[in-house]
Swiss-Prot record:
GO terms classed as biological process: DNA repair; DNA replication
Identification of the protein by name: DNA ligase
Chain positions recorded as Zn(2+) binding sites: 406, 409, 424, 429
One Gene Ontology term, aspect cellular component: cytosol
Source taxonomy: Bacteria, Bacillati, Bacillota, Bacilli, Lactobacillales
Enzyme Commission no: 6.5.1.2
Domain spans labelled BRCT: 590-668
GO terms of molecular function: DNA ligase (NAD+) activity; metal ion binding
Catalytic class of the enzyme: ligase
Record field: catalytic activity: NAD(+) + (deoxyribonucleotide)n-3'-hydroxyl + 5'-phospho-(deoxyribonucleotide)m = (deoxyribonucleotide)n+m + AMP + beta-nicotinamide D-nucleotide
Domain of life: Bacteria
Length: 668
């Protein structure tokens, strides 16, 4: 860090505090971080160093003197009898050595550590009275958290009653397993809802719900690792973990009691290599002085315990070269850029594409075709370009020019007011029509089985379908002209199209793909007004009278139905026999089939369906779709360019099916 004058340091401290406060609110209060942990940590450490150099600049409201984030939600507030402190963190093995040397100096002799995985989730406190769960709360700002007792009752691994009548408090981490996260995001994507950026956000958003029924559906898990007031016979951290496990708490059994830093470093190296194979997310390793009496002797600072430290994993990065920038048109006309890169192995998978989101983001990153870029996975899940390696930029490189024509129909692209996205506003744009029909047929909407992207594209190319109403006039003769579409597939598709006419009207409303009208909004509107034709005549005030339906949704829906083309489409659908009434929804158990109760993994590029559609198709059949191959996997289904998962399946002798073989099994 450059040497600063006092005035320069004061200005820099103010800038860092403002930035960190904004980021902390996004992270803690909104469960929607806008920067990577590594970016936040770097800024935080810079502030810590400046406050060390200029102690007079330290203030009580500095983020370095606080725990977590301020509480801004509608959940009831809970005061913690014993503050829930943050944890100090380091980013290198040298810093860990310094921590160990500091502890040794303070207590006068070497100590043993209980070394545990740092779970990437949301801190949680559980209080019991006479063995009964009486209160669950989040950390909040360390002094005051949020009451999530009602929600905790729906987390399966939290014991509601202990085997002994203890009055006590334990603490741990609430998290979402990678498989549950993938399933939740696939469902939200299918319904047109915003997906979560990573499992930590998903867990936090799911636990901090006002409606406990939502928490129940989210399949959360916990690891308990702290006993606030253990019985006197519990004298060590590893003993506390074992006893909490005996009492029925879900504890992480990977922790080890280690007596040397060489052993600690070996543990770190082992789990740095293993982290992508775990079913849950970890972002580091935690060292805790194992002896509880020494923990009490060492005590706490204002913000963190002196007896524990977290070693944070560095974000895994790889360098690759941008070969091209593709622009794709979504069903609402938003045109999104994607960087297409040389394939690289990153965090357990082969990555060759990363979203560039919108023109502003692309300009900010400064990415050009031919650039070498650093690539990481946001939340260990989503590929993201960290930066451009400028010293490797080709000499003949030129700034990338944002297109002004739609890549599908060639019409001018526009920026709508208050939007960063580029849009094509041509309602007959082939890409929008195609995406709109795919959405209409999706599981969350009309659930027309067998109508995947490949089939939709052929129907449009052959001019058999120009809008969703045309689906209800398809004939056996037309479908027989499609490539690789056999008699049974034709019969199944026509049957599914016919069956969709009986769907409840909220599925049809959602299927129309009206901007901002997701599955939940469609259901709420039809629950109140019962009939879709009536909904098409509603005013903005009538729509906003429904709880949670705001002006954005109401204005978008009324603007859509004010178009003569929308009224014409609705009339055509009614004339084709589609139900316009709200019927509610009924979930049915999957019938017996090849994939029922089987554990399945998908890998490679699929040609007939998107990954999300195929996942839902298998789940509808009662299959469990997971993200990693193990001895428990029943089948691996693979498409083109299958990578390490296929290799692992071969090694474990897991049965494998091509995409077409799997489809044949589904259609039997």
């Amino acid at each position: 860090m450059a040497v600063l004058t006092h005035n320069q340091a004061s200005q820099k401290v103010d800038e860092l505090r403002k930035k960190l406060d904004e980021w902390a609110e996004d992270y803690y209060a909104k469960d929607a971080p806008v920067v990577e942990d590594a970016v936040y940590d770097k800024a935080y450490q810079e502030l810590v160093e400046l406050e060390k150099q200029f102690p007079d600049l330290v203030t009580s409201d500095s983020i370095t003197q606080r725990v977590g984030g301020e509480i801004k939600s509608d959940l009831s507030k809970v005061e913690h009898p014993v503050p829930m402190l943050s944890m100090g963190d380091v980013f290198s093995k040298d810093e860990l050595k310094e921590f160990d040397e500091r502890i040794t100096k303070l207590v006068g002799h070497p100590v043993a550590y209980n070394v545990e995985l740092k779970i990437d989730g949301l801190s949680l406190s559980l209080e019991y009275t006479a063995g009964k769960l009486t209160r669950a709360s989040t950390r909040g700002n360390g002094r005051v958290g949020e009451d999530v007792t009602a929600n905790a009752k729906f987390i399966k691994d939290i014991p509601q009653t202990l085997p002994e009548p203890l009055t006590t408090e334990v603490r741990g981490e609430c998290y979402m397993e990678k498989e549950a996260f993938a399933k939740l995001n696939a469902e939200r994507d299918e319904k047109g809802e915003q997906v979560f950026a990573n499992p930590r956000n998903a867990a936090a958003g799911s636990l901090r719900q006002l409606d406990a029924r939502i928490t129940k559906k989210r399949n959360l898990s916990t690891f308990i690792y702290t006993w606030v007031n253990p019985p006197k016979n519990i004298t060590s951290q590893h003993q506390a973990i074992d006893e909490m496990n005996r009492l029925g708490f879900h504890t992480n059994q990977t922790g080890q009691r280690l007596e040397s830093m060489d052993e600690v470093f070996k543990f770190i190296d082992e789990y740095t290599a293993k982290r992508n194979d775990l079913s849950y997310g970890i972002d580091g390793i935690v060292l805790k002085v194992d002896d509880l009496s020494l923990q009490n002797e060492l005590g706490n600072t204002v913000k963190v315990p002196r007896w524990e430290i977290a070693y944070k994993f560095p974000p895994e990065e790889q360098e690759t070269v941008v070969k091209e920038i593709e622009w794709t048109v979504g069903r609402t006309g938003v045109v999104t850029p994607t960087a297409v890169m040389d394939p690289v192995q990153l965090a357990g998978t082969v990555v060759s594409r990363a979203s560039l989101h919108n023109p502003d983001y692309l300009r900010e990153k400064g990415v050009r075709i031919g650039d070498t870029v650093k690539l990481h996975k946001a939340g260990d899940i989503i590929p993201e370009i960290s930066s451009v390696v400028l010293n490797k930029r080709p000499k003949d490189s030129e700034p990338y020019q944002i297109p002004n024509k739609c890549p599908s129909c060639g019409q001018d692209l526009v920026h709508l007011q208050d939007e960063v996205a580029l849009r094509c506003i041509n309602p007959m744009c082939p890409a929008q029509v195609e995406e709109g029909i795919i959405h209409f047929a999706s599981r969350g909407a009309m659930n027309i089985m067998g109508l995947g992207p490949r089939i939709v594209k052929q129907l449009i190319d052959k001019n058999f379908v120009n809008d969703v109403a045309d689906l209800y006039h398809l004939t056996n003769e037309q479908l027989s002209q499609l490539d690789h579409f056999k008699d049974k597939s034709i019969t199944n598709l026509l049957t599914s199209i016919e069956n969709s006419k009986q769907n409840s009207a909220e599925l049809l409303l959602f299927g129309l793909g009206i901007d901002h009208v997701g599955a939940k909004a469609a259901r709420l509107i039809l629950e109140k007004y019962k009939n879709l034709e009536k909904v098409s005549q509603l005013t903005v005030p009538e729509l906003t009278s429904i709880d949670t339906i705001g002006e954005t949704i109401a204005e978008s829906l009324t603007a859509y139905f004010n178009q003569p083309s929308a009224q014409k489409l609705l009339q055509e659908l009614r004339d084709s026999g589609l139900n316009m009434e709200y019927l509610g929804t009924v979930e049915e158990e999957a019938p017996d089939n090849f994939f029922k109760e089987k554990t399945v993994v998908l890998t490679g590029k699929l040609s007939d369906f998107t990954r999300s559609e195929f996942t839902k198709k298998l789940q509808d059949l009662g299959a469990k779709v997971t993200g990693s191959v193990s001895k428990k996997t029943d089948y691996l289904i693979y498409g083109a360019d299958a990578g390490s998962k296929k290799d692992k399946a071969e090694k474990l002798q897991v049965p494998m099916l091509t995409e077409q073989e799997a489809i044949a099994k589904i259609e039997k």
